[in-house]
Design a protein with these regions (language model features):
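Short hydrophobic beta-strand element within catalytic cores of glycosyltransferases
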Residues: 106-109
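Nucleotide-activated donor-binding/catalytic signature segment of Leloir-type glycosyltransferases, i.e.
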Residues: 54-72
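Short alpha-helical donor nucleotide-sugar binding micro-motif in glycosyltransferases
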Residues: 76-81, 162
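Conserved small/polar residues in nucleotide/adenosyl-binding loops
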Residues: 168-170
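Conserved donor-binding/catalytic core segment of Leloir-type glycosyltransferases
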Residues: 13-30, 36-47
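Aromatic "clamp/platform" in nucleotide-sugar-dependent glycosyltransferases that forms part
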Residues: 89
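Acidic anion/phosphate-binding donor-loop and adjacent secondary structure
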Residues: 1-17, 55
Length: 170
């Protein structure tokens, strides 16, 4: 992941709404309907395209559907979110989780393969069988903890960890 692109410095919001964001294909297999049906006083944004986009745009007019975004524009959506919601129960690895963490945005997700393999540190682990409870946990996570964790997962971060472990054993 590009930690220069996905960076908390891109955050530029003045509103006080709690913003939940989903990034990915708008498709049934992504379990996005669980995100769309989350109860609470949230502003929800869906970033992405897919076969269910038109249907969900019509069914959920209160939700902001912005379509496919890339590069700087995508990075801004991650940084501006208060919580990134990853509702999938079938993805094995979500790059979007890493991009969100690099942006300093905590992740709400189910405790399934993928999220549970990435969100291993207790300070950022918000996993729960209830997406709504996971969101509440994520709202308590410090953004700097997300960023710090993501920096450990870059090639540079992994190399530093490897070298520090190697030096211990010399």
């Amino acid at each position: 992941m590009d930690t220069n692109l996905f960076n908390p410095a891109k955050r530029n919001r003045s509103d006080k709404n709690i913003r939940l964001t989903y990034v990915g294909r708008v498709a049934i297999e992504k379990n996005i309907k669980e995100f769309l049906n989350v109860k609470g006083d949230y502003k929800k944004t869906v970033v992405g395209d897919g076969p269910e986009l038109k249907k969900y745009t019509n069914k959920y007019p209160e939700i902001e559907f912005v379509g496919l975004k890339m590069g700087e524009e995508l990075a801004k959506y991650y940084a501006d979110a208060d919580v990134f919601v990853f509702p999938s129960k079938t993805d094995t690895l979500g790059n979007v989780i890493l991009e969100s963490l690099a942006s300093g945005t905590p992740v709400a997700a189910y405790p399934v393969t993928g999220p549970k393999d990435i969100l291993t540190e207790s300070r950022i682990n918000t996993l729960d069988n209830s997406l709504e409870i996971s969101i509440q946990k994520a709202l308590k996570v410090k953004r700097e903890d997300c960023r710090y964790f993501a920096l450990q997962l870059t090639w540079e971060g992994c190399t530093e960890q490897y070298l520090s472990l190697s030096l211990i054993h010399i």
